[in-house]
């Protein structure tokens, strides 16, 4: 299905209609204009703005995180864009982010409450990622930490991850000996991550699996859709006019119906004591039935959390794997080094298990370096300022949205050196910099109260997939294609995925068990 984008002619028609309506309803006096100019002067610096649209035009024609990085280099590490009717503050330096997280994390702990996609697909704030800060969010966050994705439960999913990874290597081995051996690795990795998530969420006997994944893929196609109402909150009807709202609600309605069927199946299995595994949906249903939460867990809550895990967790994990393989193919010395380490550490064993992964220290460095160059969310999920505060000497008004440009932080030469744009896993040797939120120059999963609750779960899937791919196979580009021909540009959506799929040839080196 076609999504409305910044490049759609219909978008511009709708946008200019919005401008016309805004002009009709706008009331201002000379005194209010003067007051607005005084307030504007105390905001962070801004690129030149156009009437009514503000800085929207400057974000057209490229990936927003790259455009914002260039704007930061011109106008400073903390800038304020006017996107329609919304003030959007963008932090692009370690110093700015450190001040925000250390001094004002609570003031920036909120999420925008009226974003069209999250309002519809996350059931109007019934999960964690896009839920506004407050008691209900704290409860949901605790459920994630204590019940759903704690280290013990993530480890309990090891057998599922290993089984899915072995099936993936089997499919790749089969394709490697086919008449047309070129493999779309991006597609296969995405299918693998989907399979892991659906099994830990619903089990391997989910009758609706294929249809559900089809709907999730359709939902993901709308993530980067441009919502006029997100930038003009007073003109929400424009999303109805463009057809975006009806498309989102149509896909969501189908997903909601599938959720109802899956919940009914799991409830029947639990009642008959036929549930073979303690799945994510089982845990949530038990919490709902116990009814001892301050904020009651409802069927809507259950569906919102599972939806969140799928939409926020599948594409991000698969994109990390995709980028690791891309960087290793483009850097054959690093590829040789990581494979040599793994194959020597296995000492002749052919069956790789998760318990072997801690032996692969260079793989850990490779993953870190890939997360630095290709953070899955280059622009962290937007926050909203709960009360007016001062950051780097500038006033950030209550209600302003905040974007942290993780892409810019991880390319800051002040912290990463003059070779910050280069793939160099060795830069992480002997240093304590990690991605768990304490190092502001490297925060692909966020930091503070809003750090990603599924980080451990996602990284575990990434590690087991890469370990199997690199241990069993040698990789190269299709015949006639040179390393310098490999497209390394990204497109923005729920995460920054490859602009073009990774097409490769695989050669089986270590026999499959």
From Swiss-Prot:
Which cofactors go with this protein? heme
What InterPro entries does UniProt report for this protein, alphabetically? Cyt_P450 (IPR001128), Cyt_P450_CS (IPR017972), Cyt_P450_E_grp-I (IPR002401), Cyt_P450_sf (IPR036396)
In the bilayer, the protein is annotated as: Single-pass type II membrane protein
Asked if Transmembrane is a keyword of the record, the answer is yes
Location, primary (coarse class): membrane
Cellular localisation: Membrane
Note whether ATP-binding occurs among the keywords: no
Q: What Enzyme Commission number(s) does the record list for this chain?
A: 1.14.14.113
Tissue expression summary: Expressed at highest level in rhizomes and much less in leaves. Not expressed in stems.
Return the GO cellular component terms, semicolon-separated. Answer: membrane
Which one of the record's GO molecular function terms can you name?
A: heme binding
Function as written in the Swiss-Prot or TrEMBL entry = Catalyzes the conversion of alpha-humulene to 10-hydroxy-alpha-humulene in the second step of zerumbone biosynthesis, a predominating potential multi-anticancer agent.
Q: By what name is this protein known?
A: Alpha-humulene 10-hydroxylase
What organism, scientifically named, is this protein from? Answer: Zingiber zerumbet
For this protein's source organism, the top of the classification is:
Eukaryota, Viridiplantae, Streptophyta, Embryophyta, Tracheophyta
Gene, per the UniProt record: CYP71BA1
């Amino acid at each position: 299905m076609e999504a409305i984008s910044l490049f759609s002619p219909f978008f511009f028609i709708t946008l200019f209609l919005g401008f016309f309506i805004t002009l009709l309803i706008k009331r201002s006096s000379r005194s209010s204009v003067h007051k607005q100019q005084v307030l504007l002067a105390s905001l962070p610096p801004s690129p030149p703005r156009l009437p009514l649209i503000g800085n929207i035009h400057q974000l057209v024609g490229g990936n927003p995180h790259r455009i914002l990085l260039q704007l930061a280099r011109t106008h400073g590490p903390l800038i304020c864009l006017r996107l329609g009717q919304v003030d959007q503050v963008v932090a692009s330096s370690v110093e700015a982010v450190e001040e925000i997280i250390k001094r004002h994390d609570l003031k920036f702990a909120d999420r925008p409450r009226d974003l069209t996609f999250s309002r519809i697909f996350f059931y109007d704030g019934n999960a964690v990622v896009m839920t506004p800060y407050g008691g209900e969010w704290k409860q949901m966050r605790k459920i994630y930490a204590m019940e759903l994705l704690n280290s013990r439960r993530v480890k309990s999913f090891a057998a599922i991850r290993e089984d899915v990874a072995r099936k993936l290597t089997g499919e790749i081995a089969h394709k490697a000996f086919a008449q047309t051996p070129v493999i779309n690795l991006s597609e296969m990795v995405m299918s693998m991550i989907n399979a892991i998530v659906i099994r830990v969420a619903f089990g391997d006997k989910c009758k609706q699996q294929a249809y559900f994944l089809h709907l999730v893929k359709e939902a993901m196609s709308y993530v980067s859709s441009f919502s006029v109402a997100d930038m003009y909150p007073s003109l929400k009807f424009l999303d109805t006019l463009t057809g975006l709202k009806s498309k989102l609600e149509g896909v969501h309605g189908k997903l909601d119906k599938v959720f109802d069927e899956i919940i009914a199946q799991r409830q029947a299995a639990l009642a008959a004591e036929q549930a073979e595994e303690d799945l994510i949906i089982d845990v949530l249903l038990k919490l709902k039935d116990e009814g001892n939460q301050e904020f009651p867990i409802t069927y809507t809550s259950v569906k919102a959390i599972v939806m969140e895990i799928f939409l926020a967790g599948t594409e991000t994990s698969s994109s990390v794997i995709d980028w690791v393989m891309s960087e290793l193919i483009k850097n054959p010395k690093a590829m040789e080094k990581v494979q040599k380490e793994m194959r020597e550490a296995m000492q002749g064993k052919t069956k790789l298990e998760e318990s072997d992964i801690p032996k692969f220290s260079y793989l850990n460095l490779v993953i870190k370096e890939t997360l630095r160059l290709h953070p899955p969310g280059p622009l962290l999920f937007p926050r909203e300022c709960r009360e007016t505060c001062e950051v780097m000497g500038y006033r950030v008004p209550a209600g302003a949205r905040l974007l942290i440009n993780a892409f810019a932080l991880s390319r800051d030469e002040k912290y990463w050196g003059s070779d910050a744009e280069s793939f160099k896993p060795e830069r992480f040797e002997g240093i304590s910099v990690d991605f768990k939120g304490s190092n502001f120059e490297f925060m692909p999963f966020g930091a503070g109260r809003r750090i990603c609750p599924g980080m451990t779960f996602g990284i575990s899937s990434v590690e087991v997939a890469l370990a199997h791919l690199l241990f069993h196979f040698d990789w190269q580009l299709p015949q006639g294609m040179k390393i310098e021909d490999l497209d390394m540009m990204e497109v923005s959506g729920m995460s920054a995925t490859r602009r073009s799929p990774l097409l490769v040839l695989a050669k089986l080196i270590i026999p499959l068990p």
